[in-house]
Structure formats: structure tokens, C-alpha cells
């Protein structure tokens, strides 16, 4: 049985194909969905601004009469606002070229209509919550569009990012996705999510085989920068010679460090004897010292028998790289290394070459503003941008998560054609996001500061039309919640009190003895 439609107002004189002004004698909410019937179509609209007015209060009212006016004004309230035209419900949200005529009736959109728009799982969608103004209407997003067009999850600290990302992860795992999380704070290693009784979280070993590094990645570990031209030249030559010898079988992989340092020592001796390069000797000694320091400093990170991190990734698993115990420099190198390898291996598979990765991967970068910074150049930023530009062709999706959008590289952010934006208060953050997302209107931006925890603006290719959504609670548990300082202080003091009681009891027993 069809729902009875509720008329809430009419269109006013001024309208365009994309926007219409309206008046309503009923209380209507910002963000509510409405239906308009014109051009033989059922057109969905979204109330993007609203104001309230009464003719009883004018600029010259007498303050002493305000109480009398209040008693009768509630019966003469009118609501004025703007409706954004979203499209024809029955024609894939195609926007009619003709604006709605003045006087067109406006109805509250039925739940059935909204379900038709925001959909159900067709095998490629996941539910992330319900409409903010209609709790009975679930909101589904398209996983293929998330992976191919990328995603950004943005909010202030405590706005609900961790729960939102967890909901996305759980939905993808139900589709047997290979999800990779670059976990900056160790929140996801304890993520408790089970499929058929099995915990599907896989912690990847944070070990690197230097043989698998690119020269630029290796050079970064050795602290040889772009301006150290002479050191760079000799280290590059020694590194490539060593890798070629390992690849050809001339030496075993466990001889890597010895051969590398041996090459540099040979160059040092050549510089001693050859007057043409004698001025290079000091630089060669310097880079040899850096390699020795590097081998010692990263002895726990490097493993000459470790298989590549990318080869450890599995489908139907939450694959986690825990960066909570390493500094930003190491995190930068590893993220760039993994993204580079993912892109190269997916290209090989798609083009039919051996050594490729046979399944798509969705990578989630927490604290994305650190490694894809708007002000600092990092190796990661380059590969994040590469994956964002090329990933859709090869089944590589990217999710950027940040509580500091203004510090996030606008080029990387603009490549995320899907966004889940929770509460954002800072105007500079709002402007930065709007600059990256051309479809984000000023009216929608204004709503971001008034969102409550867990409420979000969801937009992009993954959803038919922008929506204000109440994100559902994730089923899995993780350690991303705020810690209670008061509770922890109380526990410490209780331990001290218990210890003092034990000491007092001990001395009391001694005295009796």
C-alpha cells in the first residue's frame, strides 16, 4: 500500500532547473527530502536552507507588547527556504531541464521513494547508516565506486572518524575485500571483527628486505639527500652493483651489506690512488659511515630473508601495518614502498605479466595529513598522488583519513571523488575541503559545524545524491576511543592505597611477632 503523501508547501516565483524557493506553513527541517511533481516526473529535492518569519513582528514593534504577540504568533509562522533539485527518481536522478513552475506543490518525500534512491544491497553495496532525518531509511554506498574513485573521511578529533572507517572496513570484509590499513597509532591491530567465528585481522610483519627497496627508498634510510651529489653518485653505483650481483646469483642475499660496503671501500681506495677523483675521497668515507650507521640503526627493521610486505596481503582480511612504534621518517618510506609495489604489481597482473597481484586492494591511510602534507614534500605524497590518479585502472583504492583537512595536500584530496565529512568547525578546514570538492556547495559547508558526533555529509560517486547520514555503530571493537584520564588517575591512586595497606599490615605483623 502506497504511503499517503504530506503536502508541506509550494514553490515561489523564482526557480531554476537546479534550485527553487519555497514557502511552507509547517515546520520543516534543514536537510529534509521533498518531492515535486512536474514535467511528468517525480523529482526529489533537498532542503538546503530554511528560515522562519511572521508578519506580526516588524521593525517597529513595541517591546512592551511582545508577550501578547508571542501568544498569537505561533499560529502565523511561515517557513521560507531553498530546495536543491536532485533529480528524477525514475530516471537515474536526471535533472529536468525545465524549472518547477511557481505554485508547484511540494510534498515530504516518502520513505519508499527514498529507499528507491538510497537503495539496498545489490551485491556491490554496503550499508553505512540511515538518513539523518529518516531513521527508517538505510543508506547504502557502492563499493566499486569507493575503490575506483577513492574516499576521504574527514572530521574534528572525536567526530566519529574511527567508527566510520570501521563501518566501511566491516562492509568491505563482508565482500571478501583485501583491506590494507596504514595504522599510525596502533588502533586497528586490536580490531575485533570475526567472519564465521574467525578473527580476520592480520598484522603484517614490519620488516623490510633492503634488496627489495628502490634506490631512492634506500638512500632515504641512509640520510643521503638530493644535495649530496657526490655521496649520491657513489652510493647509487654501489647499491645497483650489489643488487645486480644478487639477482645474477654471483653472491647470496645474506652478503648484501658486506658487498655494499666492500664496493664503497673499493671506491675509497680508488680515490686515494686516482688524482682525478681524490677530492671525492672525503665524500666516499662519509657515505660509508652513513651506510654503517644505517645498518646498525635499523637492524631490527631490516631482514635480508623477509618477503615483500605486499606479498603478505590477503583478501578477506584486514591487513594492518602498525606504525605506532616507528617515527614518521620510517612510516613515510614504508608507505611509499608499499604503494609503489602495489601499483607495479597490479599493473603487471592487469597487463598479463608474471609476478602480479591478482586481487584489488583498498588502502586506508590514517593521519593522512602527516604523509600527504600540504606543506611538506614526502615520498609518500608522490605515491599517494600516483595511486589516486592511476589506481582506478588497476583496482587500487585509497582512503585518506584526517582530522586536519587544511594540512592535507589539496591535489591528493581532490582525487578522492567520494567524501564522508563529519563535524568540521574550523572555517579554514571547511574552505580547504570545498576547494578540493567542487560539488560541495556553500549551504552544505555551513552545516558541517552543526553536525553531532557520528553525523556526516556523504557525497560522491558512491551515492546517488549527497545525503546527511547518521553513521551506524561498528560491530567490531577497536582501541580508537578516548581514554578516561579520571578513571586512570583513580586506578593509580587505588594501587597506591592498596600498597600502603599491605606495608602497614606487614609492619603490624612484625611488631606482634
Walk through the language-model features, giving the residues of each:
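Conserved nucleotide-binding/hydrolysis micro-motifs of P-loop NTPases
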Residues: 52-53, 87-90, 185-189, 325-328, ...
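Conserved P-loop NTPase motor module
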Residues: 454-513
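Basic- and hydrophobic-enriched, low-structure N-terminal and domain-boundary segments
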Residues: 1-154, 168, 357-359
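Loop/turn-to-beta-strand initiation segments
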Residues: 175-180, 316-318, 358-362, 394-399
Amino acid at each position: 500500500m502506497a504511503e499517503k503523501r504530506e503536502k508541506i508547501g509550494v514553490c515561489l516565483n523564482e526557480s531554476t532547473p537546479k534550485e527553487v524557493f519555497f514557502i511552507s506553513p509547517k515546520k520543516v527541517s534543514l536537510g529534509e527530502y521533498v518531492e515535486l511533481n512536474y514535467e511528468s516526473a517525480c523529482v526529489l529535492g533537498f532542503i538546503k536552507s530554511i528560515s522562519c518569519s511572521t508578519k506580526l513582528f516588524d521593525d517597529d514593534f513595541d517591546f512592551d507588547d511582545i508577550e501578547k504577540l508571542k501568544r498569537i504568533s505561533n499560529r502565523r509562522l511561515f517557513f521560507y527556504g531553498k530546495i536543491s533539485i536532485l533529480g528524477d527518481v525514475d530516471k537515474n536522478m536526471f535533472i529536468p531541464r525545465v524549472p518547477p513552475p511557481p505554485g508547484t506543490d511540494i510534498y515530504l518525500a516518502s520513505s519508499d521513494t527514498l529507499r528507491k534512491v538510497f537503495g539496498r544491497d545489490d551485491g556491490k553495496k554496503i550499508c553505512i547508516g540511515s538518513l539523518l532525518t529518516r531513521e527508517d531509511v538505510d543508506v547504502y554506498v557502492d563499493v566499486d565506486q569507493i575503490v575506483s574513485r577513492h574516499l576521504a573521511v574527514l572530521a574534528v578529533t572525536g567526530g566519529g572518524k574511527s567508527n566510520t572507517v570501521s563501518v566501511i572496513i566491516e562492509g568491505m570484509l563482508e565482500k571478501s575485500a583485501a583491506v590494507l590499513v596504514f595504522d599510525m597509532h596502533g588502533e586497528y591491530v586490536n580490531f575485533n571483527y570475526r567472519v564465521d567465528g574467525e578473527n580476520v585481522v592480520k598484522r603484517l610483519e614490519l620488516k623490510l628486505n633492503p634488496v627489495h627497496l628502490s634506490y631512492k627508498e634506500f638512500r632515504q634510510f641512509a640520510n643521503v639527500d638530493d644535495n649530496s651529489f657526490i655521496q649520491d653518485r657513489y652510493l647509487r653505483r654501489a647499491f645497483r652493483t650489489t643488487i645486480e650481483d644478487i639477482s645474477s646469483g654471483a653472491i647470496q642475499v645474506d652478503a648484501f651489506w658486506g658487498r655494499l660496503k666492500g664496493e664503497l671501500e673499493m671506491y675509497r681506495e680508488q680515490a686515494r690512488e686516482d688524482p682525478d677523483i681524490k677530492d671525492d675521497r672525503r665524500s666516499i668515507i662519509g657515505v660509508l659511515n652513513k651506510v654503517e650507521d644505517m645498518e646498525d640503526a635499523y637492524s631490527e627493521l631490516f631482514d635480508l630473508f623477509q618477503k615483500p610486505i605486499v606479498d603478505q596481503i590477503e583478501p578477506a582480511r584486514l591487513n594492518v601495518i602498525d606504525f605506532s612504534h616507528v617515527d614518521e621518517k620510517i612510516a613515510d618510506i614504508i608507505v611509499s614502498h608499499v604503494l609503489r609495489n602495489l601499483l607495479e604489481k597490479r599493473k603487471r597482473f592487469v597487463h598479463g605479466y608474471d609476478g602480479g597481484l591478482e586481487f584489488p586492494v583498498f588502502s586506508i591511510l590514517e593521519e593522512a595529513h602527516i604523509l600527504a602534507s600540504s606543506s611538506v614534500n614526502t615520498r609518500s605524497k608522490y605515491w599517494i598522488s600516483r595511486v589516486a590518479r592511476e589506481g582506478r585502472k588497476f583496482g587500487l583504492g585509497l582512503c585518506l583519513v584526517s582530522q586536519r583537512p587544511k594540512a592535507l595536500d589539496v591535489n591528493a584530496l581532490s582525487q578522492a571523488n567520494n567524501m564522508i565529512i563529519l563535524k568540521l568547525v574550523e572555517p579554514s578546514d571547511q574552505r580547504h575541503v570545498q576547494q578540493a570538492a567542487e560539488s560541495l556547495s556553500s549551504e552544505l559547508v555551513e552545516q558541517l559545524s552543526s553536525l553531532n558526533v557520528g553525523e556526516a555529509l556523504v557525497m560522491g560517486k558512491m551515492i546517488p545524491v549527497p545525503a546527511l547520514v547518521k553513521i551506524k555503530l561498528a560491530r567490531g571493537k577497536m582501541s580508537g576511543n578516548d581514554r578516561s584520564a579520571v578513571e586512570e588517575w583513580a586506578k593509580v591512586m587505588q594501587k597506591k592505597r592498596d600498597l600502603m595497606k599491605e606495608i602497614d599490615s606487614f609492619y603490624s605483623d612484625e611488631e606482634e611477632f
